[in-house]
């Protein structure tokens, strides 16, 4: 019998890596929960509650056929990379980049992860902005509201985000 996504979420939180791997054999990796998240979207937000190492978990999802660039089926339609940036989760972010995540994937509003990195920048080290740009993120992709990451950086007055562009 196939597990539903809510059952797999509980498995992620309460079992070992081997048990998670076994559970994935009975799971449709392309399924979404009622909020529009696939298992990678869920993991990108809840990974600190899972015992297994981040690299191993993401590779396991890839091995079972997850599309690491898939966007949520509802809400803002963000990818796991968008979520990692918004949560400032360097662990997830770095692994997704190493595994080939598209730095220019657009969400339901046309925002790329770099737009989100500019938006959540708060005077910290600029890691997400700099890393995305160095990995080929385009600074000029216009979202559904006519704003690019570079334009957003120029408009933000409370932090000096312009310096990254």
What are these regions (language model features)?
Residues 1-64:
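Intrinsically disordered, low-complexity regulatory segments in ankyrin-centric signaling systems
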Residues 16-24, 50-63, 89-97, 122-133, ...:
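Ankyrin repeat structural motif
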Residues 2-9, 32-46, 71-80, 106-118, ...:
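Ankyrin-repeat boundary/"N-cap" motif
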Residues 10-15, 42-53, 83-89, 116-125, ...:
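Ankyrin repeat A-helix N-terminal signature
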Residues 138-165:
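Leucine-rich solenoid repeat scaffolds
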Residues 75-94:
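Eukaryotic tandem repeat interaction scaffolds
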Residues 98, 102-104, 134, 138:
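Tandem repeat domain/solenoid detector
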